[in-house]
C-alpha cells in the first residue's frame, strides 16, 4: 500500500511547488479583454515598484532590489537618476523637488525641472519601523501635502509605533508629519480621483481562510480602517470604515491608476485600474491579474464594481497610464518586465 501512496504524495508535492513557482516564472501567457492587445516592451527592470511617465518619452522606474531610481527613454535605454537607496518603493516629484520613499525613510532631493542636477538630499522622516512590510507609495495631494503609505511590521498585532499600518501626512518643506488614517495593514498605493477623493488599496491579514477581501478604500481624514481588529466574525469593527470595492481574498491588490479621458481602455472618468499580485496563501493560483474598478458616487456614498481586464500576467506591482492613454504595468518576478496594453488596430 505504501509503495502506491508514495508516488502520489510525490506528485502532489511537485504540483504544489510548481504552483508556487509558476507566477514568478517567464512561462505565463497574459491574456486581455477582446479588442485589446498586450505586449512586453522592456525586460530586466530589476525589482520594479514604481512607474511614472515624466513626459511622453521618459518613464521613471523604481528598482527596489537594485536600490535605484532610473529612467527609460523611448528606446528603453536606461539612465540612473539616484542610486545607493534602501529598498526604494516609490517616488513623487514637483518642478523643483523629488521625494523618495525608502525603507522607513522619506527623503527629498532638488532637481532642475528636467530630472537633472539631482542633489541636496534631505531626510524628511526617518525611523519608521519595517518588518513584514515597509513604507510604500508617496503621493502628492491636490493641496500640496504629501501622503505616505506605511505598512505594518506584522500580520496581526498592535503596533508599537502608530506610524505603522497607517497613511501619513507629511509637510513637504519641513518633514513634520502625522497620522492621516489608521487601521491600514499594508497599503501599497493610492490615487486621487476627481469628484471622488483619494482611493487606496489595502492588503488584509493572512491565515484566515477566505477573510478578508482585498480592498479599495476611500480616504477619510482621521478614519480607522479596521486592522488589526477586523477578524472573520467582525470584518468591519464598530467605528471603522469599510471598503468601497473588494476583490478575491489574499490576492494582494497593489498598484492603482486613474483611467484618463483619452484612454482606449473601457471605463469612465472615475474608473481606476489596479494590479493584483497573487498570493502564496492559497492552494490554487489566484490573482496575477489587472482589474478594472468602476467607481460610482451614489447618494453620498461611493460604490466600486470590480472586474478582470487581464489575466495570467505574473506578479504585477506598479501601474500607470501613458499620456496617450495606453496602460503600462511592470511585474516584479522574472527580473522585472514592462508590459503595455493598448487597443487593437
Report the location of each language-model feature.
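Beta-propeller domain segments
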Residues: 21-32, 135, 152-157, 162-179, ...
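Beta-propeller domains
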Residues: 59-75
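Asp-box/WD-like beta-propeller blade repeats and closely related beta-sheet repeat scaffolds
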Residues: 104-141, 149-152
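Mature N-terminal segment immediately following signal peptide/propeptide cleavage
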Residues: 29-53
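A short beta-strand motif characteristic of beta-propeller blades
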Residues: 37-43, 77-83, 122-128, 175-181, ...
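Residue-level marker for isolated small/hydroxyl-bearing positions within beta-strands
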Residues: 54, 62, 101-103, 149-151, ...
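Secretory targeting signatures
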Residues: 1-23
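Beta-rich, blade/repeat-based domains predominating
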Residues: 44-58, 84-103, 128-146, 182-197, ...
Amino acid at each position: 500500500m505504501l509503495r502506491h501512496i508514495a508516488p502520489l504524495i510525490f506528485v502532489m508535492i511537485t504540483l504544489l511547488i510548481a504552483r508556487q513557482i509558476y507566477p514568478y516564472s517567464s512561462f505565463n501567457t497574459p491574456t486581455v479583454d477582446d479588442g485589446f492587445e498586450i505586449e512586453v516592451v522592456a525586460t530586466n527592470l530589476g525589482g520594479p515598484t514604481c512607474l511614472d511617465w515624466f513626459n511622453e518619452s521618459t518613464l521613471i522606474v523604481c528598482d527596489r532590489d537594485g536600490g535605484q531610481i532610473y529612467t527609460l527613454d523611448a528606446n528603453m535605454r536606461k539612465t540612473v537618476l539616484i542610486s545607493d537607496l534602501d529598498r526604494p518603493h516609490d517616488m513623487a516629484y514637483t518642478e523643483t523637488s523629488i521625494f523618495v520613499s525608502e525603507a522607513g525613510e522619506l527623503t527629498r532631493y532638488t532637481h532642475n525641472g528636467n530630472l537633472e542636477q539631482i542633489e541636496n538630499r534631505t531626510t524628511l522622516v526617518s525611523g519608521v519601523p519595517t518588518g513584514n512590510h515597509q513604507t510604500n507609495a508617496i503621493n502628492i495631494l491636490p493641496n500640496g501635502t504629501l501622503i505616505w503609505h506605511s505598512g505594518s511590521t506584522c500580520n496581526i498585532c498592535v503596533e508599537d509605533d502608530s506610524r505603522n499600518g497607517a497613511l501619513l501626512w507629511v509637510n513637504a518643506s519641513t518633514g513634520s508629519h502625522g497620522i492621516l488614517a489608521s487601521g491600514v495593514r499594508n497599503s501599497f498605493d493610492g490615487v486621487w480621483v476627481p469628484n471622488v477623493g483619494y482611493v487606496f488599496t489595502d492588503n488584509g491579514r493572512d491565515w484566515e481562510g477566505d477573510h478578508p477581501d482585498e480592498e479599495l478604500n476611500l480616504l477619510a481624514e482621521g478614519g480607522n480602517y479596521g486592522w488589526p481588529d477586523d477578524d472573520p466574525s467582525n470584518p468591519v469593527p464598530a467605528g471603522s470604515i469599510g471598503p468601497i470595492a473588494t476583490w478575491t481574498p489574499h490576492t494582494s491588490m497593489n498598484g492603482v491608476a486613474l483611467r484618463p479621458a483619452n484612454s482606449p481602455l473601457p471605463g469612465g472618468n472615475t474608473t481606476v485600474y489596479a494590479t493584483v499580485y497573487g498570493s502564496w496563501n492559497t492552494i490554487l493560483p489566484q490573482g496575477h491579474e489587472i482589474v478594472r474598478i468602476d467607481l460610482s458616487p451614489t447618494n453620498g456614498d461611493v460604490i466600486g464594481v470590480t472586474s478582470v481586464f487581464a489575466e495570467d500576467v505574473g506578479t504585477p506591482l506598479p501601474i500607470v497610464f501613458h499620456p496617450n492613454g495606453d496602460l503600462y504595468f511592470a511585474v516584479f518576478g522574472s527580473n522585472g518586465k514592462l508590459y503595455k496594453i493598448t487597443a487593437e488596430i
